[in-house]
Amino acid sequence: MIYLASSAMSEIVMFVAVLLIAAFVAGILTTSTYKISLNINKKGDALATKLSQDFEIINDPGDIVRNSSAGTIALYIKNTGKDPIIFTNDSFTVIIDGSIVEINTTNQLTSPGSNILSPGDVGEIVVNYNETGYHRIKVISECGISRIIRGYIS
């Protein structure tokens, strides 16, 4: 009789141990799934922002105008996205032939004085660059969207 009672008791202890382990594993899986879903939401929001903000470089690739006395060139940016784009010297980066060049000024041409490019608006980025010839120009926005133009600087 004692043998039967100890056998039943050990089975109960094992059963409780298995239940505790199963609850622990379920808790870990629930927490992991929650963290994954939060990260997916963050990535989705970032991607939605990136997709709703877009721009194009609208310079004529055959003749990118250079101001030789000031040592600058002008790049024209059009907001082709659905959302406004902040348009300041710090909100864009310009790379010419692999080298980052300094932005001299940004000018909102559609609504002068504004620091926002609304959808359809055109802005001018004036960069310090005084070399002629064919060049590869890359403009990158603060949210990571980049556009490239290969053109002749006259």
From Swiss-Prot:
The keyword Transmembrane helix applies. It is a single-pass membrane protein. Keywords: Archaeal flagellum, Cell membrane, Membrane, Transmembrane, Transmembrane helix. It is found in: Cell membrane; Archaeal flagellum. One of its GO terms (molecular function) is structural molecule activity. The keyword Transit peptide does not apply. GO terms for biological process: archaeal or bacterial-type flagellum-dependent cell motility. InterPro entries: Flagellin_arc (IPR002774). Belongs to the archaeal FlaG family. This is Putative flagella-related protein G. It comes from Methanocaldococcus jannaschii (strain ATCC 43067 / DSM 2661 / JAL-1 / JCM 10045 / NBRC 100440) (Methanococcus jannaschii).
